[in-house]
């Protein structure tokens, strides 16, 4: 009789792992403590809730996360099914209606006869049986302590932040204009143009605004990909102009000119009734967010549906603990997945859950676990988190820097080079799947 598998945590990674197990005929006990016990960042009990942005970033094969998405589609990923079904306009990126997205994932998993849902907290590592731990960076204290004891080393951490969401009907449409950078895809973003004087006033107010106190927070402990806007602004007067307020490729169609700075708003739900402020992750006090962000042209009367906030994320010393199959080195049958392993980002977390779920299924079926080719985005992430120097281990997004370069003549054009790497990765994945996984 095939062994049942326990999956702890129904976030992006846990949901994907449960799906990969169930589609291979494996019985799954899926545990999720929400909504009985909430985290500092979640707002519902739905599976795969997106707590920060609603963007899954680029859909292009010239971008590593675009390659990762396409690989996951090839592997019949539930998270990619949900994202494609619940997407909202975002130019060349993939963004979703976060409520529809989490509901899609929840409905899919609860409808599967192989998956039994348990809405309860697990406070200890199961002592036996095949298990996937995917409790995320906001793992409850009791279980986090047990994981740390298992690691035999202190878990690492960084601070993550979310951007505010504003009501669409409170945006001044006479000031903002619709456009995607370089006109990629459809005109999907609302753009708030700033003159130099407006930018200088805003940047000065931002740097001097009062932040919320968070125990243990230091600016050095933020993840670069989710850096609070006020921390970024403090690095220099023009730092924001090369980051989230970069105006390049965003000419104002009203006068044909490129503004000095541009704040972008991205649609947050299918009804287009809410927009998030792109790149404005923050831990300013709520009153300060209202005061400072209403200085942005077009947002003078903005109504905040959700203010930005920050929370602490914990991750493991994976190079010392895990194999590239996401299985624990010192305990066969125990797998970890998601941001807690040191992959960073929604898609990356789901991708790790996909690999862990496939390998947990193989373990349950009495087959050998597999490691994905390092020439793929899935394989390169697993390789990075398990082979990098543990002393300098930091969370990592999907990146072409993690994937071996092309052999032969060097391609100078970066976009073309990246597309060729993606082409090779998808071919290698197809061959790997046919040889190792299509039993």
Curated annotation (Swiss-Prot):
Keyword Hydrolase: no
Keyword vocabulary terms for this entry: Cytoplasm, FAD, Flavoprotein, Methyltransferase, NAD, NADP, Transferase, tRNA processing
Pfam families membership: GIDA (PF01134)
Location(s), subcellular: Cytoplasm
Keyword Flavoprotein annotated: yes
Molecular function (Gene Ontology), one example: flavin adenine dinucleotide binding
Family the entry assigns: Belongs to the MnmG family. TrmFO subfamily.
Descriptive protein name: Methylenetetrahydrofolate--tRNA-(uracil-5-)-methyltransferase TrmFO
């Amino acid at each position: 009789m095939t062994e049942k598998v326990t999956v702890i945590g129904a976030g992006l990674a846990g949901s994907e792992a449960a799906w990969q197990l169930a589609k291979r005929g494996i019985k799954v006990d899926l545990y999720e403590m929400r909504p009985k016990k909430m985290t500092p960042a979640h707002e519902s009990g739905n599976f795969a809730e997106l707590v920060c942005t609603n963007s899954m970033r680029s859909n292009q094969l010239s971008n590593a996360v675009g390659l990762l998405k396409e690989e996951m589609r090839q592997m019949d990923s539930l998270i990619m099914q949900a994202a494609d079904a619940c997407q909202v306009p975002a130019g060349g990126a993939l963004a979703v209606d976060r409520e529809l997205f989490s509901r899609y994932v929840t409905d899919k998993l609860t409808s599967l006869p192989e998956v039994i849902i348990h809405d309860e907290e697990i406070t200890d590592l199961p002592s036996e049986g095949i298990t996937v731990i995917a409790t995320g960076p906001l793992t409850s204290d009791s279980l986090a302590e047990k994981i740390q004891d298992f690691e035999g080393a202190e878990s690492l951490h960084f601070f993550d932040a979310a951007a505010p969401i504003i009501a669409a009907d409170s945006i001044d449409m006479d000031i903002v204009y619709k456009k995607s950078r370089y006109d990629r895809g459809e005109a999907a973003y609302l753009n708030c143009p700033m003159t130099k004087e407006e930018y200088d006033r805003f940047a000065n107010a931002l740097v001097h605004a009062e932040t919320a106190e968070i125990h243990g927070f230091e600016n050095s402990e933020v993840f670069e990909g989710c850096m609070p806007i006020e921390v970024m602004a403090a690095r220099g007067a023009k730092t924001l102009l090369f980051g989230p307020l970069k105006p390049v490729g965003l000419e104002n169609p009203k006068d044909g000119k490129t503004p000095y700075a541009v704040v972008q708003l991205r649609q947050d739900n299918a009804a287009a009734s809410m927009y998030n402020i792109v790149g404005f992750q923050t831990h300013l006090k709520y009153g300060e967010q209202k005061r400072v962000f209403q200085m942005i042209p077009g947002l003078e009367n903005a109504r905040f549906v959700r203010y930005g906030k920050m929370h602490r994320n914990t991750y493991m010393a994976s190079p010392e603990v895990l194999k590239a199959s996401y299985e624990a080195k010192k305990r066969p049958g125990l797998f970890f997945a998601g941001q807690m392993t040191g992959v960073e980002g929604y898609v990356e977390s789901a991708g790790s859950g996909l690999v862990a779920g496939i390998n947990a299924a193989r373990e349950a079926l009495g087959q050998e676990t597999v490691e994905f080719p390092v020439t793929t985005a899935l394989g390169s992430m697993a390789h990075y988190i398990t082979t990098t120097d543990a002393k300098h281990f930091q969370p990592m997004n999907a990146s072409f820097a993690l994937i071996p370069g092309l052999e032969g003549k060097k391609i100078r054009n970066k976009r073309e080079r990246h597309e060729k790497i993606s082409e090779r990765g998808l071919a290698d994945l197809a061959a790997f799947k046919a040889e190792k996984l299509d039993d």
